[in-house]
């Protein structure tokens, strides 16, 4: 096992910095809590410090949208300024410089983050993303969304997120493994089953989680499978985890349609994005909702057929050819064209910002389901609402993944293995309960589902904060 860097702790819960000079597979780590001021190490380059933003700085786009939505939902609640302040800032942020050896003996330098937003209801929980455009602002925004997501589902968890700015498509499998292990070596002091539990996210998967849990257990010298979820089943991963986000989102869609008195059976769905979530949504859509899938796309190509796209034919073509180009199951459309095709529901399973102020007026779907994080901008979402298009927000629509991750934690803690049937039944029950609670909140306050979901989450988090004495108010 590679030698770990010597860590210098400066003030309890404030700053953690590495005192070693850089070398292959080592790192610099800076951990900051609340508004603690970082103390620069002489070995730390100024570029690293220049790239760090204080938590209290003016938020940029992604985080600003989340905070604006939270402040909008506050009007439905009795929340003090202090309580809102706690909700609006990260509890802890860790930024690390990761130095990873290339296959040719040279070295990459990456920057990784772990943002731990709020743990009033339980340990921090959130995925790890590998992406070229990953930023600290994006990681913060997604950590705040995870705080809301776990609370909407009433899970005993908080919210966090991690990310590394890299292009995994340019890395070999051994290089991705070394990067994954380096990230855990940098972050392990702030991770653990009772502290912060990562999971897969964009461009990370069960294989990556397997490397990460192995590295964590090697450092700690004991088995700790509950440290990371989304692992391979042989390492304690839960059955049903790969399809959990899609299954959860379809269950929510089906429940909302029933609440509206508009069953989906026989109607049409368009799925924008065909990664893990989108492909599983295509596979499961008819069984869960009774609807037919009429459109699919990846980042470069798409298909549309108003009569329906058979999953087996389309997925097999995609797997063989890497895109939908030339697939005879439907007419070729671009990803942009697919967004504006008519459908009973449009499932957004690709990236952030797919619907914004420029294209929201062209959307023809009756409902939009956010299976990705922040796929609808604040302006785009408002225009959809103004046009009477119902939006199922990401903190409800894609919460199936974290729910089954929680099931995985429960199984790991008790050394049990649930059947897939048990996982699916429990997931559908949890998603139905959360959907009913959000719809009830929306009806009681005459508001949209996003505002209702955020308000419900904030209400539950603030109750936990008050019970902990984190405000001048008390729940007693």
PLM feature segments, named:
Residues 131, 150-265:
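Glycine/serine-rich phosphate-binding loop and adjoining beta1-alpha1 elements at the start
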Residues 56-97:
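Short, Gly/Pro- and small/polar-rich lid/capping loops
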Residues 96-168:
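Glycine-rich, N-terminal phosphate-binding loop and its surrounding beta-alpha-beta segment
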Residues 301-391:
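Rossmann-like adenosine-cofactor binding region
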Residues 59-60, 256-257, 362, 366-476:
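Adenosine-phosphate binding glycine-rich loop
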Residues 240-243, 247-340:
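Glycine-rich phosphate/diphosphate-binding loop of Rossmann-like nucleotide-binding domains
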């Amino acid at each position: 096992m590679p030698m770990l860097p010597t860590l210098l702790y400066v003030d309890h819960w404030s700053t953690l910095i590495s005192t070693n000079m850089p070398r292959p597979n080592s790192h610099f780590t800076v951990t900051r809590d609340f508004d603690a001021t970082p103390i620069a190490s002489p070995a730390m380059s100024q570029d690293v410090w220049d790239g760090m933003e204080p938590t209290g700085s003016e938020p940029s786009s992604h985080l600003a949208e989340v905070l604006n939505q939270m402040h909008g939902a506050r009007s439905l609640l009795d929340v003090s300024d202090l309580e809102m302040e706690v909700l609006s800032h990260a509890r802890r942020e860790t930024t690390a410089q990761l130095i990873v050896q290339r296959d040719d003996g040279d070295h990459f330098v990456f920057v990784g983050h772990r943002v731990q937003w709020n743990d009033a209801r339980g340990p921090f929980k959130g995925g790890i993303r590998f992406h070229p455009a990953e930023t600290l602002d994006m990681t913060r925004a997604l950590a705040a969304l995870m705080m809301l997501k776990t609370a909407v589902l009433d899970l005993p968890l908080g919210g966090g997120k991690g990310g590394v700015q890299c292009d995994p498509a340019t890395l070999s499998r051994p290089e991705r493994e070394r990067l994954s292990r380096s990230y855990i070596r940098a972050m392990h002091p702030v991770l653990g089953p009772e502290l912060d539990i990562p999971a897969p996210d964009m461009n990370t998967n069960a294989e990556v989680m397997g490397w990460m849990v192995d590295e964590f257990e090697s450092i700690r010298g004991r088995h700790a499978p509950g440290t990371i979820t989304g692992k391979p089943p042989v390492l304690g991963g839960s059955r049903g985890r790969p399809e959990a986000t899609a299954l959860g989102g379809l269950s929510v869609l089906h429940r909302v349609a029933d609440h509206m008195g508009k069953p989906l059976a026989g109607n049409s769905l368009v799925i924008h994005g065909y990664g893990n979530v989108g492909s599983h949504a295509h596979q499961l859509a008819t069984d869960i909702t009774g609807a037919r899938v009429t459109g699919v796309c990846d980042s470069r190509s798409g298909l549309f057929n108003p009569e329906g796209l058979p999953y087996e034919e389309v997925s097999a073509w995609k797997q063989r050819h890497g895109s939908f180009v030339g697939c005879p199951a439907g007419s070729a459309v671009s990803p942009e064209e697919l967004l504006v095709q008519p459908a009973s529901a449009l499932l957004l399973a690709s990236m952030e910002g797919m619907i914004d102020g420029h294209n929201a007026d062209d959307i023809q779907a009756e409902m939009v389901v956010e299976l990705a994080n922040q796929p609808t901008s604040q302006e785009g979402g408002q225009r959809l609402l103004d046009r009477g298009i119902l939006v199922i927000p990401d903190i409800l629509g894609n919460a199936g993944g974290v729910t089954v991750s929680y099931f995985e934690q429960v199984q790991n803690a008790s050394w049990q293995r649930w059947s897939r049937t048990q996982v699916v039944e429990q997931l559908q029950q949890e998603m139905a309960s959360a959907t009913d609670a959000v719809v009830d909140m929306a009806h009681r306050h005459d508001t949209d589902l996003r505002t209702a979901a955020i308000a419900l989450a904030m209400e539950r988090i603030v109750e936990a904060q008050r019970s902990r004495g984190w405000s001048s108010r008390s729940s007693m």
